[in-house]
Amino acid sequence: MVSKRKSRTSKTIEDSCIHLCSVFFRFLYYTLPALFLFFFLLYLCLSFTTGISYNNFHMCIFSRKFNDPYCNTAGSKPGFQIISEENVTFAGEIAGDRVSKDHNKILNSVPVQEHKTKNKVDLNSLIELKAEEEYSKYIKPTSEDEGYALRAAIKYLYLQRSWLSPGDENLNKPRSCEGKGVYVYDLPSKFNSDLLVGCNDILPGVNLCSYFKNEGFGEAIKNLGKGWFATHMYSLEPILHSRVLKHPCRVYNETQAKLFFVPYYGGYDVLRWHYRNVSEDVKDRLGIEVLKWLNSKESWRRNAGKDHVFVLGKITWDFRRDKDPWGSRFLELQEMQNPTKLLIERQPWQVNDIAIPHPTYFHPRTDDDITRWQIKIMSKLRRNLVSFAGGARPDNPNNIRSTLIEQCISSNQCRFLNCTNESCTNPKNVLDLFQDSEFCLQPPGDSATRRSVFDSLISGCIPVIFTPYTAYYQYAWHLPEDHRKYSVYISEQDVKEKRVNVVEILKAKTLKEKKDMKSYIVQQLLPGLVYGDSNAKFEKFRDAFDITFDCLLKKINRSVV
């Protein structure tokens, strides 16, 4: 009897277990797919919403090169992403000693080599905070999309500032080249020097041959003294090529290189087709060929071009052809998304576009050349409160130049140099004007940036800026975060709507304000805005080339592990 009772109890327990298991597995079978489907649909919904609100924005650049505003929608194609490119992500960046001690205090608090995950989050958070604080500082967004665009521009700017390098602290000590090898490709001549051979026919009716003398500096201007040349605004490519060939850390073995320099003169390549009726295939051909040539190199394939640098001596928009037939598509090619591009004007939503100073007429060789010039312009008596060298843009109703010219010529404290009659082709005319003025008006011209900004700065003339895209959102490595140290900002919109008189605003600046700005420009900024010649030997100063390559090496060290 005992045995039968135990057996009956055991069977009851077994039946209960089977029943519970059956219920459990039926729950899994019928409920989990529904839950999975619910969360998947929720994820898709959130992703779609985020994509609309964050990844797409619409910005327009006005230029006389285009009949209509030149507009870009970020997020619409691979070249216009707000989210960082494959090789650089805000959340994925490691902070620490990459932050310049000279500039961004907001990034300085992140400890070096400690809690790397926390550092990534901290850097990302700090950049997000800065973007939120500053996105409407200069331009008041008129739509949500424009607000996102401005935030993105600020984020990329501060990420670029995080690559600032103070250089060797003791410039008198021998430079260490450990981990700083620079390799210069020996490209077939069709990609560089051959483009200069037809210098009398690059632009129809214009002979550029004199500008290619002296390694791209142009002919010497003897009446201005030592180190002054008639340098063309688009001469950056041969100037930097000549200089990098004599870089103190140049290596001749690819395996020893940290940075690879590609001397393709893309600016001259695209310039020769600007005013000729040729097909888009012709405009794009040489750029595609240089990428095919590079793709045959293991050094290019190893890091997908992330450690490669191109110098393009024109504005970024000349290499981003979209609907308008102007220019090439070189910077829109997928292979060009990873390399670093040095340009005189960058695309503010491309983190690997780096803007560096326009070439000026001054190319010192020694510290003494710089010091002598600093002393001269600091002691210069300036008879004009303000000046403007330029021409009107009557075919562009959005340009403020006509209003500025009108305000200038109606004041006895403003001097206007009309560039439409070729007065500005003589460098001495422009430099004399700037050295004789306290403030120099710098409105946008064919594009947002102006070579004249740098001509005025090296002349000790305080630039007056009307849009942040002229300087503040451009030259992260060469101009400081605080624009008030070296410039005056007046809203372009205020001028356009004639709510302000620029001359009257500048009259209100105190003697101390002007003295402090001029001193900062001449003593602190000037050496880093000029390109020394290929034999330059600087011990006290770093010129624009030195700053650029110090920062490039830091960027690449952070991007390529």
Curated annotation (Swiss-Prot):
Expressed in hydathodes. The keyword Coiled coil does not apply. One of its GO terms (molecular function) is glycosyltransferase activity. It is found in: Golgi apparatus membrane. Its EC number is 2.4.1.-. The keyword Transmembrane helix applies. It is a single-pass type II membrane protein. The chain crosses the membrane at residues 32-52. InterPro entries: Exostosin, Exostosin_GT47. Residues 1-31 are cytoplasmic. Functions in xyloglucan synthesis by adding side chains to the xylosylated glucan backbone. Involved in the galactosylation of hemicellulose xyloglucan. This is Probable xyloglucan galactosyltransferase GT20. PANTHER family: EXOSTOSIN HEPARAN SULFATE GLYCOSYLTRANSFERASE -RELATED (PTHR11062), XYLOGLUCAN GALACTOSYLTRANSFERASE GT20-RELATED (PTHR11062:SF335). GO terms for biological process: protein glycosylation. Residues 53-561 are lumenal. Belongs to the glycosyltransferase 47 family. Glycans are attached at N87, N253, N277, N418, N421, N557.
